[in-house]
Amino acid sequence: YWFGYGSRSVRLWLRLFDQKGSELASWIERLPDSAAGFAIDSEQIRKTYDTGPFTGQLFIHVLNATGHDVVKYALDVYDDDGDTLSCTHDANAWPAELYAGLPAPDTGERVTLWIQNSHPTKIPSNSIGLNRMGSRDVFRFEKDIAPFASHGLDIGASLPQLSWPEQIEIQA
């Protein structure tokens, strides 16, 4: 990608964080000096760094980038049974105050909102809220999220009165 903007010797500096925001591993990957895709294989990372199953996030910093230097979000969720569906939202580190479109769970479903803090400072308790679309009654998440930590918020447990096809707004 960056090769098309004239970049050469592009490298990725990567840091893997666990769910609590602690560093699991750091390493550098060299990208080819040609137009090419690049994959980061989470199964290989787990083997290389002996992490076992975990929840966390991968911070990617692009070195020697020319032009556009944004790396978009990637989500990796494994489900051996094929019963898990994942989706992502734009991963800008500058959040809006309101996001919409998260579905309430249907009967027998579990919807998890993954809150990932991509900053070196905590997200304070009560600064994230959920509500039924259009409602002023807001559920506030009452825990801090540590720097670079991740938290899976169970939507059904947080808003048990809501169900599909209702939609949820996320207050940030």
Predicted regions and their residues:
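Gly/Pro-rich, tryptophan- and cysteine-flecked surface segments typical
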Residues: 1-172
